[in-house]
Amino acid sequence: MAQRGRPRNFNRTHALDRALMAFWQNGFEATSMHNLVEAMQINSPSIYAAFGSKEALFAETIDYYREAYARQLLQSLNDAPDAASGIEAMFEAAIELFTHQDTPGGCFVVNSVASNAPRGLELEQVLTRLRWQRSEQIAERLKTDVRAGKLRDDTPVQDLSDLYAVLLQGLAQAARDGLGKTRLMRLCEHSRHLILPWRMN
């Protein structure tokens, strides 16, 4: 049973993590306040007092997801010595996240858009922007390699980055549908090959 008041040792990060799991599993609309109370183990007045509204709580879980779960994808992309290796590392990190046994599966952002997305225009725009932010990040990595002479000047940066972003979303949905990690990793191995025609010798 949920506690009747906000516990003295209320941990906002822990509460956000539990709310994230509920939204990740069910989607925004299908996650009821009862679901959140059970997941977060605090009562609804305390949830409203701490976060303002269900929409505001969802918005905060988006930020939390980016920092606590999805940050590794960007770090993997940028820490590699070249874009091809970075994209492969990003895909590997994504698959680890999408198939982790302690999460509902897939990508929280993609799941939120695909099923029971929030109806408010502002949150819809935030989710859409986040989905395509990966394309922008990959494009920056490709441009870095072009400037460094690792990729040809005629590299179709936008086309490649959009394609990779779409592939990531597809991997997320496949993981959500239960496609195993081994099969997903085999797909990941081919990710670097898309860049090969534009690599400098």
What kind of feature is each model-predicted range?
Residues 86-87, 100-125:
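Amphipathic alpha-helical segments used for helix-helix packing
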Residues 60, 74-105, 157-164:
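Hydrophobic alpha-helical connector segments
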Residues 15, 19-23, 94, 168, ...:
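Short hydrophobic clusters on alpha-helical segments that form packing/core surfaces
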Residues 97-100, 144, 164-182, 194-201:
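Amphipathic C-terminal alpha-helical segment
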Residues 1-10, 155, 199-201:
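N-terminal intrinsically disordered/low-complexity leader segments
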Residues 105, 110, 114, 155-174, ...:
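Hydrophobic alpha-helical segments that form the core
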Residues 70, 85-88, 121-147, 159-162, ...:
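Amphipathic alpha-helical packing segments from all-alpha helical-bundle domains
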Residues 2-3, 14, 22-56, 60:
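Helix-turn-helix
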